[in-house]
């Protein structure tokens, strides 16, 4: 039986497999195909971001790196986007899924709650475990996707996955 793999030309040229999640774009980014069609890679959003979390990524398109800091939702990136690739009216501003990786200190039986301490939305809570260290749980409905927890984690044990 013959199997075929469906790779878009862009994904193939960028070395991404169909299972690789899309990069995290600045808040208010249109859906990926429309974003790529409108973004002129002018770098205005990169240079205007006061937190320094937007960088020139693959193909010159802007991406967000939460390891550099959190998004304060100041929307300056949207304000300077003349080509319409970022829109303040898009809701939600982005759809991110946060994952706690195995290298999390709490998962390795070391008491650490840094991520919860910096989460203004209180989307991270630590669930007590009988005879064990409390482990983090993320409430996706409460999480704003600001990335403060990612920047603060001493083990880089949180990752954000973009969805659409």
Regions found by a protein language model. Give the residues of each.
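Non-ligating segments of multi-cofactor redox enzymes
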Residues: 1-164
């Amino acid at each position: 039986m013959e199997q075929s793999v469906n790779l878009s030309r862009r994904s193939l040229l960028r070395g991404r497999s169909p299972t690789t999640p899309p990069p995290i774009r600045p808040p208010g980014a249109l859906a990926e195909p429309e974003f790529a069609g409108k973004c002129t890679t002018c770098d205005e959003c990169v240079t205007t971001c006061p937190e320094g979390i937007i960088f020139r990524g693959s193909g010159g398109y802007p991406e967000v790196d939460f390891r550099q800091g959190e998004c304060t939702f100041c929307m300056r990136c949207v304000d300077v986007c003349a080509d319409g690739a970022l829109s303040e009216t898009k809701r939600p501003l982005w759809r991110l899924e946060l994952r706690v990786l195995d290298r999390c200190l709490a998962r390795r039986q070391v008491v650490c709650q840094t991520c919860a301490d910096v989460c203004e939305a209180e989307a991270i809570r630590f669930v007590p475990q009988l005879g064990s260290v409390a482990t983090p749980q993320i409430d996706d409905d409460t999480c704003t996707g600001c990335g403060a927890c990612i920047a603060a984690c001493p083990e880089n044990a949180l990752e954000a996955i973009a969805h659409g």
